[in-house]
């Protein structure tokens, strides 16, 4: 009996290794075909990391050298940062610092006179759900038209928020109007009730409470030996950390970098909550984060496919791509991070997603 169990264990281990090797080969093939220098991916359940791997090179210029990818390499999350900002907002609601229906101008009455009256009733939840009508600020052209703001990051974001609230709102019949800028205004509310900057809140929750590593901004701005982002100019090239590219005004919407190990842990906390388990947040808070609105909840876009509810998000600053898909019905998550922000790389990412889901259904 013992021999049979040992034989079964060896067979099972062999099958797992074979599946991992197979998916690694397919990842390498996709990366070559779609010019992706480095990729990290994971499949996660509430109680298990099914697979997790990082492969490739930090820079396209190193592509003919020995691979230097490391499992702890950081990737820029882009707009997948929104789920982290939403998570922190959820944490503040549980600390009784703020409520989802808190109105912005009840916290900042001094800004009301100079703001557009159509914004008078906007709430924290509406800002995080893209239902407050805030202008999008999803393109560089919008930022180039801004006046010059003075001070540190927090002061500049506050001035940015004041400016945003003077603009006409986005008004149409869409279920939501995606806005990076709306998250900057939401962050201002979170800062007001906590007495801390958004940056301090991220450190409190991610680093101090959850023991997760992260960086703000591009990985290579913290360490040159981390992955570099890539864009086409017109050929694919790595983007130097000294490049004039500043996302600080919309940092709460899209400027955190994490490695696949710690980002997977963060996603796993969300899966546990969706499975009904309390952790740093209560299960009911996770339900609100994911399901408080049909089309776009708090940091997550929602869709129903074949009677299964999915939440997903794609993040990019134009140099990296980050994608996470969560099957709420199981729940299970698929995560793919790459250091190329081109449309071609995005096609490769979604092609690999199909392969990953087929290998680990």
Q: PLM features: residue spans?
A:
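Short, glycine/proline-biased beta-turn/loop segments that scaffold the active-site neighborhood
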Residues: 99-115, 209-210
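Short, surface-exposed loop or secondary-structure junction motifs
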Residues: 57, 116-318
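Short, well-ordered beta-strand elements
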Residues: 312, 322-340
């Amino acid at each position: 009996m013992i021999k049979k169990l040992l034989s079964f264990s060896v067979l099972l281990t062999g099958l797992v290794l074979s599946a991992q090797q197979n998916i690694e080969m397919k990842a390498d093939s996709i990366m070559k075909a779609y010019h992706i220098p480095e990729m990290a991916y994971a499949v996660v359940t509430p109680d298990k990391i099914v697979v997790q791997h990082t492969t490739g090179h930090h820079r396209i210029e190193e592509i003919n050298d020995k691979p230097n990818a490391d499992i702890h390499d950081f990737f820029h999350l882009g707009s997948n940062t929104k789920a982290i900002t939403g998570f922190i907002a959820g944490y503040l609601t549980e600390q009784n610092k703020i409520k989802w229906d808190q109105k912005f101008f009840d916290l900042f009455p001094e800004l009301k006179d100079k703001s557009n009256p159509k914004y008078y009733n906007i709430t924290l939840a509406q800002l995080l759900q893209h239902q407050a009508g805030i202008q999008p600020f999803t393109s560089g052209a919008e930022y180039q038209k801004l006046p010059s703001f003075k001070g540190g990051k927090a002061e500049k974001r506050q001035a940015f928020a004041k400016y945003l609230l003077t603009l006409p709102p986005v008004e149409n019949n869409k279920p939501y109007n995606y806005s990076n800028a709306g998250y900057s205004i939401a962050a201002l509310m979170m800062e007001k009730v906590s007495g801390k900057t958004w940056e301090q809140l991220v450190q409190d929750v991610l680093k101090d409470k959850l023991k997760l590593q992260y960086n703000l901004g591009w990985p290579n701005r913290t360490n040159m030996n981390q992955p570099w982002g890539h864009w086409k100019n017109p050929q694919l090239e790595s983007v130097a950390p000294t490049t004039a590219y500043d996302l600080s005004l919309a940092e709460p919407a899209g400027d955190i970098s994490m490695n696949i190990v710690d980002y997977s842990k963060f996603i796993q906390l969300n899966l546990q909550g969706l499975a009904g388990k309390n952790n740093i947040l209560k299960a009911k808070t996770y339900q609100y984060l994911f399901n408080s609105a049909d089309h776009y909840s708090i940091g997550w876009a929602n869709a129903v496919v074949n009677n299964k509810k999915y939440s997903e998000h794609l993040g990019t600053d134009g140099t990296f791509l980050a994608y996470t898909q969560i099957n709420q019905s199981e729940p299970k998550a698929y995560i793919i991070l790459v250091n190329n922000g081109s449309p071609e790389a995005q096609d490769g990412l979604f092609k690999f997603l199909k392969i990953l889901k087929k290998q680990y259904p």
